[in-house]
């Protein structure tokens, strides 16, 4: 599981966090999973680095298989989120990142997270995530499944607006497309 005592010096711990573990209804947030991760890391004298995700290939269903991290309420009408299956990396289903309800859920969660956690000393930094496989902002080799640029921009702007103190980290290849 990657959790344990290590003799190698370290001060940070990393975790993925499913969006559906945070967003439990429209505008309704549950912070217990993130609070637990933060408390555990702080209890070991460390800070947490984390990334939210929606699509984690070959992951997370009880007993194995795939389970989406799209919040459950977005799977029902009106305008339910639809999915495109893929077989790479063990398989999964990319959500329709252009679905406005999904975009609103992502940006709302980021804003709420910023209101609650910006400046929290238990957080080393937050990885910009949510979009693409593992929240890594790519769907290679299925590039057509990646979020439209309007969704990418909405997520960027949400992180930028929500976090003034806590550092938000992006990979250089994510930045390349915006320069």
State what each model feature region is.
Residues 1, 178-179:
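Solvent-exposed N-terminal domain segments of exported/luminal and surface proteins
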Residues 1-102:
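N-terminal substrate-binding region of glycoside hydrolase catalytic domains
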Residues 9-11, 44-48, 119-124, 164-168:
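Short, well-ordered coil/turn segments that N-cap beta-strands
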Residues 13, 41, 113, 126, ...:
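Conserved, mostly hydrophobic/aromatic
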Residues 27-37, 103-112, 145-158:
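Well-ordered, non-membrane alpha-helical segments in soluble/globular domains
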Residues 35-43, 118, 159-163:
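Short, surface-exposed basic-aromatic patches at helix termini and helix-loop junctions that form
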Residues 77-103, 107-145:
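Active-site groove signature of glycoside hydrolases
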Residues 122-134, 153-178:
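Aromatic-lined carbohydrate-recognition surfaces of secreted/lumenal glycan-active proteins
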């Amino acid at each position: 599981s990657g959790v344990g005592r290590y003799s190698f010096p370290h001060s940070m711990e990393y975790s993925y966090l499913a969006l559906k573990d945070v967003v439990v209804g429209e505008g309704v947030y549950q912070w217990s999973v993130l609070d637990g991760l933060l408390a555990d890391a702080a209890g070991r004298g460390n800070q947490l680095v984390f990334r939210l995700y929606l699509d984690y290939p070959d992951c997370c269903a009880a007993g194995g298989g795939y389970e989406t991290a799209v919040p459950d309420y977005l799977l029902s009408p009106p305008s339910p989120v639809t999915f495109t299956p893929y077989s790479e990396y063990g398989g999964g289903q990319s959500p329709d990142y252009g679905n406005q309800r999904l975009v609103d859920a992502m940006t709302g969660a980021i804003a709420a997270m910023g209101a609650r956690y910006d400046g929290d000393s238990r957080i080393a930094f937050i990885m910009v995530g949510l979009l693409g496989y593992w929240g890594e902002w790519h769907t290679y080799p299925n590039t057509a499944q990646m979020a439209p640029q309007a969704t990418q921009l909405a997520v960027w702007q949400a992180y930028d607006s929500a976090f003034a103190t806590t550092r938000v980290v992006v990979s250089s290849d994510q930045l390349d497309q915006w320069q």
